[in-house]
Swiss-Prot record:
Top-level taxon of origin: Bacteria
Described function: Catalyzes the interconversion of 2-phosphoglycerate and 3-phosphoglycerate.
Record's protein name: 2,3-bisphosphoglycerate-independent phosphoglycerate mutase
A Pfam family that the UniProt record links to this protein: Metalloenzyme
UniProt gene name: gpmI
Keyword flag Transmembrane: no
Species the sequence originates in: Chloroflexus aurantiacus (strain ATCC 29366 / DSM 635 / J-10-fl)
InterPro entries attached to this UniProt entry: Alkaline_phosphatase_core_sf (IPR017850), BPG-indep_PGM_N (IPR011258), Metalloenzyme (IPR006124), PGAM_B_sf (IPR036646), Pgm_bpd_ind (IPR005995)
Keyword annotations: Glycolysis, Isomerase, Manganese, Metal-binding
């Protein structure tokens, strides 16, 4: 049988598998093409959370972890598990980079600032790591330790911060160290889409003590709830003393430890602190936006001055070349899927819109920034809207057009595309919008799959984790905006020789089995470190 060309991996981001129900937007959506392929083509489900992707048991999956496992071809030991294991083993408390930050403030009699996403969400950060840093500060008898909490409400319930605050206040009371200085919704502190006006508001609270004011973190959160503002969108708020002064701000000579272990939403705020060329970078970004006819914010934020003698530690590497210290440096996947394809002399094409572009490039390629030889990439800009329920189709039509052009060019042996809609719209909690998001993906695939088949190619359609299939929280009955532990779909669409009569996809698989499956379709041998197994079982 002739090798199929192109082999296309289609990732329906956040489209998990769950029983039908009023909160299963993926099932409620009118998706005749996806429904037919799931019913009539070789189909299975894949483990996409917990131990299946190198996370703690029961931990929800996410896009970074998912794409890393998909590309690696083996279960990748995730940073959450890696850091938590270091805490359990005691290695965390002798980490040389963390100790360097401790020594920095001791020598200068300055302050240590701990900032990051707050709570047990486990996608970007985990409260256990913050608690361990407080324990470290306690062991070294630090007095001036300030916390800057970025409220979640997305990977956890929308209004869950007060419960996490109870836990944190208990830890602070037990250890006798730590004072909360600011709180901010992740919408501001963790923007990743170059909306610098949001980052600027978070930075102003952290460094200048400018923003909303509240006498305590609890008061700040309760005031936001009273205005019907959930955790994710809490305005950057400065906790003030009885005299109205900021409890603490980040100053020259201080040390900062950014507790996020996932890179993508930590980069922008980190740049605000450490990038010497920040203002020029921001200016050029908005000049490009203006030239492209895109709307500009009412005011363009610029950093007034860069802090001096600042020891800035990130828990993991957020980006190559950032002038920071890294507590847990990367351990690269050396031979990911893209490398094997490149080494075979084949051409490949990676495409997604902005929100998922790092996932089909950096994460899929094992943490490598640069493309491999023979690898082309295309970034489709995500729409500039406040939240994606306002435009649930996002940029799926534009992704589809560019993908069709790549298929029609007949240049590529392998193509990977990510449709961001089910996940990004899923995070808004709006069931009608998520239904439209899933329908937008179905409409795109209705055009893409026939083009693949016409050229003698095959499509392997998967998800990287669940989200859209569970929009109602089973405990509260309210909106569920987080990822899930549900399995991901996996189905193979091809011509003669690839139907149910010739092939089945084995059960019990996980995301790490996707790369070996694709390499079998490409008639290539997996790299020696790929311990995943092809899902394809050929019938006799």
């Amino acid at each position: 049988m002739t090798r199929p060309r192109p082999v296309v991996l289609i990732i329906m981001d956040g489209w998990g598998i769950a029983p039908p129900g009023p909160g299963n937007a993926a099932d409620l959506a009118d998706t005749p093409h996806v429904d037919a392929w799931m019913a009539n083509c070789p189909f299975t489900t894949l483990g996409a959370s917990g131990l299946d992707v190198g996370l703690p048991e029961g931990q929800i999956g996410n896009s970074e972890v998912g794409h890393l496992n998909i590309g690696a071809g083996f279960v990748v030991y995730q940073e959450l598990t890696r850091i938590s294991k270091a805490i359990a083993d005691g290695d965390f408390f002798t980490n040389p980079v963390l100790l360097q930050a401790i020594e920095h403030v001791k020598q200068r009699n300055s302050a240590l600032h701990l900032m990051g996403l707050f709570g047990p969400g486990g996608v970007h950060a985990h409260e256990d790591h913050l608690h361990a840093l407080l324990e470290l500060a306690h062991r070294h008898h630090l007095q001036r330790v300030y916390l800057h909490l970025f409220l979640d409400g997305r990977d956890v319930l929308p209004r869950s911060a007060l419960g996490f605050l109870d836990t944190l206040e208990g830890v602070i009371a037990r250890l006798g160290v730590g004072t909360i200085a600011t709180v901010s919704g992740r919408y501001y502190a963790m923007d990743r889409d170059k909306r610098w006006e949001r980052t600027g508001r978070a930075y102003a609270a952290l460094v200048d003590g400018v923003g909303e004011k509240a006498p305590s973190a609890r008061a700040a959160i309760e005031a936001s709830y009273a205005r019907d503002v959930s955790d994710e969108f809490v305005l950057p708020t400065v906790i003030v003393t009885a005299s109205g002064e900021p409890t603490a701000t980040v100053r020259d000579g201080d040390a900062v430890i950014f507790t996020n272990f996932r890179p993508d939403r930590g980069r922008q705020l980190t740049r605000a602190f450490v990038d010497p060329d920040l203002n020029e970078r921001i200016r050029q970004h908005y000049e490009r936006q203006k030239a492209e006819g895109q709307p500009l914010p009412a005011t363009i934020w610029q950093r007034e001055r860069q802090l001096r003698d600042l020891c800035f530690v990130t828990m993991t590497q957020y980006e190559e070349g950032l002038p920071v210290l890294v507590a847990f440096p990367p351990r690269y996947v050396t031979n990911p899927l893209a490398a094997v394809i490149s080494q075979a002399g084949l051409r490949q094409f990676h495409i997604a819109e902005t929100e998922k572009y790092p996932h089909v490039t950096f994460f899929l390629n094992g943490g490598r920034e640069e493309p491999f030889p023979g690898e082309d990439r295309q970034l489709i800009p995500s729409p500039k809207v406040a939240t994606y329920d306002l435009k649930p189709e996002m940029s799926a039509p534009e992704v589809t057009e560019a993908l069709l052009a790549a298929i029609d060019s007949d240049q590529y042996d392998f193509i990977v595309v990510n449709y961001a809609n089910p996940d990004m719209v899923g995070h808004t909690g709006s069931i009608p919008a998520v239904i439209k998001a899933c329908e937008a993906v179905d409409a795109g695939l209705a055009r893409v799959v026939p083009a693949i088949l016409e050229r003698g190619g095959v499509a392997l359609v998967i998800a990287d984790h669940g989200n859209a299939e569970q929009m109602i929280d089973p405990e509260t009955g309210g909106p569920h905006t987080a990822h899930t532990t549900n399995p991901a779909p996996c189905f193979l669409i091809g011509g003669a020789g690839y139907g149910k009569d010739a092939i089945e996809l084995r059960h019990g698989g996980r995301l790490a089995d996707v790369a070996p499956t694709l390499l079998e379709l490409l008639e290539l041998e997996p790299s020696p470190d790929m311990t995943g197994q092809s899902l394809i079982v050929r019938r006799a």
